[in-house]
């Protein structure tokens, strides 16, 4: 798990709907379900928040990184 996900787990321990909101967004089914579970009790909301965080891990955008070729004819080129 990424450090951002661990931070969300820490937030979920205190306020589960806030962690789900930060992870999935405001107008989502996950937030509505978590809020309803949180109204039923703290532990159902916590378990659902941990489930949402683990099912949707943080992924860095690797499209902004490009790999350089190993051939010598491209030495010094940027593309």
Curated annotation (Swiss-Prot):
PROSITE patterns xrefs: UPF0057 (PS01309)
Membrane-protein topology: Multi-pass membrane protein
Keyword list, A-Z: Lipid droplet, Membrane, Phosphoprotein, Transmembrane, Transmembrane helix
Phosphoserine modifications at: 71, 77
Pfam families in the record: Pmp3
Cytoplasmic topological intervals: 1-6, 54-79
Vesicular compartment residues: 28-32
Compartment(s) of residence: Membrane; Lipid droplet
GO cellular component, one term: fungal-type vacuole membrane
Residue ranges crossing the lipid bilayer per the database entry: 7-27, 33-53
Additional notes on this entry: Present with 20400 molecules/cell in log phase SD medium.
PANTHER family per the UniProt record, alphabetical: HYDROPHOBIC PROTEIN RCI2 LOW TEMPERATURE AND SALT RESPONSIVE PROTEIN LTI6 -RELATED, PROTEIN SNA2-RELATED
Family per similarity comment: Belongs to the UPF0057 (PMP3) family.
Protein name: Protein SNA2
The encoding gene: SNA2
């Amino acid at each position: 798990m990424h450090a951002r996900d661990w931070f969300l787990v820490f937030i979920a321990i205190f306020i589960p709907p806030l962690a789900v909101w930060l992870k999935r967004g405001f107008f989502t089914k996950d937030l509505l379900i978590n809020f309803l579970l949180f109204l039923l009790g703290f532990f159902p909301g916590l378990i659902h928040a941990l489930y949402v965080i683990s099912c949707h891990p943080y992924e860095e955008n690797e499209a902004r990184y490009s790999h350089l070729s190993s051939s010598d004819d491209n030495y010094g080129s940027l593309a």
